[in-house]
């Protein structure tokens, strides 16, 4: 049962992060197309946003490992 819970935790985190990264990058590219002179600042902000979104699957993996190796 712990393995199923771990798999669901990782799956949910991966799907959510994939969707979130897609939205962040999509909106950044859209903004760069509207204002090319802001592309440097937008790119920096995008990388920060992607890093924050990627924290979710990392936490999902940690929770999954706790579920699998819990006594």
UniProtKB/Swiss-Prot annotation:
The UniProt entry lists membrane topology as: Multi-pass membrane protein
- Please name one Pfam family that this protein belongs to: ATP-synt_C
User: Does this UniProt record's set of keywords contain Transmembrane?
Assistant: yes
The source's superkingdom equals Bacteria
Per UniProt, the keywords (alphabetical) are: ATP synthesis, Cell membrane, CF(0), Hydrogen ion transport, Ion transport, Lipid-binding, Membrane, Transmembrane, Transmembrane helix, Transport
Instruction: Name one molecular function that GO assigns to this entry.
Output: lipid binding
Q: Which GO terms describe its cellular component?
A: plasma membrane; proton-transporting ATP synthase complex; proton-transporting two-sector ATPase complex, proton-transporting domain
The keyword Nucleotide-binding is assigned to this record: no
Main subcellular location: membrane
The record's listing under Gene3D superfamilies reads: F1F0 ATP synthase subunit C
Q: Where in the cell is it found?
A: Cell membrane
- CDD domains in the record: ATP-synt_Fo_c_ATPE
From the record, give the transmembrane residue ranges: 4-24, 47-67
| Protein family according to the UniProt entry | Belongs to the ATPase C chain family.
- Quote additional remarks: Dicyclohexylcarbodiimide (DCDD) binding to the active glutamate residue inhibits ATPase in vitro.
- Subunit composition and interactions: F-type ATPases have 2 components, F(1) - the catalytic core - and F(0) - the membrane proton channel. F(1) has five subunits: alpha(3), beta(3), gamma(1), delta(1), epsilon(1). F(0) has three main subunits: a(1), b(2) and c(10-14). The alpha and beta chains form an alternating ring which encloses part of the gamma chain. F(1) is attached to F(0) by a central stalk formed by the gamma and epsilon chains, while a peripheral stalk is formed by the delta and b chains.
The free-text function statement in the UniProt record for this protein reads: F(1)F(0) ATP synthase produces ATP from ADP in the presence of a proton or sodium gradient. F-type ATPases consist of two structural domains, F(1) containing the extramembraneous catalytic core and F(0) containing the membrane proton channel, linked together by a central stalk and a peripheral stalk. During catalysis, ATP synthesis in the catalytic domain of F(1) is coupled via a rotary mechanism of the central stalk subunits to proton translocation.
Name used for this protein in its record: ATP synthase subunit c
Q: Which gene encodes it?
A: atpE
């Amino acid at each position: 049962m712990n393995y199923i819970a771990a798999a669901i935790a990782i799956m949910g985190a991966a799907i959510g992060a994939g969707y979130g990264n897609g939205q962040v990058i999509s909106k950044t590219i859209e903004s760069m197309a509207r204002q090319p002179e802001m592309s440097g600042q937008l790119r920096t902000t995008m990388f920060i946003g992607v890093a924050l979104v990627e924290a979710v699957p990392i936490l999902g993996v940690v929770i999954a490992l706790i579920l699998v190796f819990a006594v």
